[in-house]
Amino acid sequence: MGMSFSHLLIVLLIIFVLFGAGKLPQVMSDLAKGLKAFKDGMKDDGSDNDKNK
C-alpha cells in the first residue's frame, strides 16, 4: 500500500507548518544533499566490495 497524492500533500503541509516558509528551502536543500551523499556512499560501497573479492 503506497502513499497516495492526498497523503503526500498532508505530509508536505505538516512539514510546512513545522518549519515555516522561511526555513523550508534550507530544509529541502539539506535533504537533497543528504540523499545525494547517501547515493554516493552506496555507489562507493559496492565498488569496495568488488575490489576485495
UniProtKB/Swiss-Prot annotation:
Quaternary structure and interacting proteins, as annotated: The Tat system comprises two distinct complexes: a TatABC complex, containing multiple copies of TatA, TatB and TatC subunits, and a separate TatA complex, containing only TatA subunits. Substrates initially bind to the TatABC complex, which probably triggers association of the separate TatA complex to form the active translocon.
Chief location: membrane
Subcellular location: Cell inner membrane
Gene Ontology MF term list: protein transmembrane transporter activity
InterPro entries, per database record: TatA/B/E (IPR003369), TatA/E (IPR006312)
NCBIfam families on file: PRK01470.1, tatAE
Similarity comment text for this entry: Belongs to the TatA/E family.
Gene: tatA
UniProt KW keywords: Cell inner membrane, Cell membrane, Membrane, Protein transport, Translocation, Transmembrane, Transmembrane helix, Transport
Transmembrane stretches, start-end: 1-21
GO BP term, example: protein transport by the Tat complex
Entry GO terms, CC: TAT protein transport complex
Matches recorded under PANTHER family: SEC-INDEPENDENT PROTEIN TRANSLOCASE PROTEIN TATA
Organism listed in the record: Rickettsia rickettsii (strain Sheila Smith)
Record-given protein name: Sec-independent protein translocase protein TatA
Membrane topology qualifier: Single-pass membrane protein
Gene3D superfamilies xrefs: 1.20.5.3310
Function: Part of the twin-arginine translocation (Tat) system that transports large folded proteins containing a characteristic twin-arginine motif in their signal peptide across membranes. TatA could form the protein-conducting channel of the Tat system.
Disulfide bonds: none
